[in-house]
């Protein structure tokens, strides 16, 4: 892939009842939404069936939208251990889907995503939705989980951009006798 080709990233906000996702093409500073949405699951279904649905639907999305990379939100461990375990399972189903399709997978905490997108690591859900609408030039605010998926993809693209700009400079400094 040439350096002038956009990188397509799918961002995943895993959940055992609703999994949000967003696909963004990034080229330099430019980012454009490809598609976004949610995978809504019946909470009355047994967890293994919901995990299968997350996996199958993400594989289908990856096949259709052809992202180059995947970014997934890390599990936030709350006081409710059962919820954290279910979230971890949903996250695992998403990661396996990406790995099965051969995608490199990056992981970010919710705080990293919020800080990268809003500039504040404790931003509220509605702030994230509005920021996604503004930054990605959307007609309306995306659903919360879809906005999170878009934000995760955007965070990853921003991290890639930052590494591409700073890493060559660091290497160049080392080659000139600088220190790491």
UniProtKB/Swiss-Prot annotation:
Q: What class of enzyme is it?
A: hydrolase
Q: Which cofactor does it need?
A: Mg(2+)
Question: In which residues is Mg(2+) 2 bound?
Answer: 73
Binding-site residues, Mg(2+) 1: 13, 145
Give an example GO cellular component term for this record.
Holliday junction resolvase complex
Active site feature: 13, 73, 145
Report the EC code(s) recorded for this entry. Answer: 3.1.21.10
- Alphabetically list the UniProt keywords: Cytoplasm, DNA damage, DNA recombination, DNA repair, DNA-binding, Endonuclease, Hydrolase, Magnesium, Metal-binding, Nuclease
Where is the protein situated, by its record's location annotation? Cytoplasm
One Pfam family linked to the record: RuvC
- Gene Ontology terms, MF aspect: crossover junction DNA endonuclease activity; DNA binding; magnesium ion binding
Q: Which GO terms describe its biological process?
A: DNA recombination; DNA repair
Tell me the CDD domains matching this sequence: RuvC
Query: What's the superkingdom here?
Result: Bacteria
What is the catalytic activity of this protein? Endonucleolytic cleavage at a junction such as a reciprocal single-stranded crossover between two homologous DNA duplexes (Holliday junction)
Q: Which family does it belong to?
A: Belongs to the RuvC family.
Subunit structure and binding partners:
Homodimer which binds Holliday junction (HJ) DNA. The HJ becomes 2-fold symmetrical on binding to RuvC with unstacked arms; it has a different conformation from HJ DNA in complex with RuvA. In the full resolvosome a probable DNA-RuvA(4)-RuvB(12)-RuvC(2) complex forms which resolves the HJ.
How is this protein named in the record?
Crossover junction endodeoxyribonuclease RuvC
Source organism of the structure: Magnetococcus marinus (strain ATCC BAA-1437 / JCM 17883 / MC-1)
């Amino acid at each position: 892939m040439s350096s002038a080709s956009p990188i397509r990233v799918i961002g995943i906000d895993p959940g055992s009842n609703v999994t949000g996702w967003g696909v963004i093409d990034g080229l330099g500073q430019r980012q454009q939404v490809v598609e976004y949405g949610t995978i809504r699951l019946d909470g009355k279904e047994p967890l293994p069936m919901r995990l299968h649905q997350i996996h199958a639907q993400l594989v289908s999305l990856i096949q259709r939208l052809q992202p180059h990379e995947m970014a997934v939100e890390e599990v936030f461990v709350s006081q409710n251990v059962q919820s954290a375990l279910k979230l971890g399972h949903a996250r695992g189903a998403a990661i396996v889907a990406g790995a099965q399709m051969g995608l490199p997978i990056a992981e970010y905490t919710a705080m990293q995503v919020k800080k990268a997108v809003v500039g504040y690591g404790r931003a509220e859900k509605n702030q994230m939705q509005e920021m996604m609408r503004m930054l990605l030039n959307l007609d309306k605010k995306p659903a919360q989980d879809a906005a999170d998926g878009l934000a995760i993809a955007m965070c990853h693209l921003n991290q890639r951009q930052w590494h591409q700009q700073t890493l060559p400079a660091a290497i160049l400094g080392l080659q000139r006798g600088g220190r790491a």
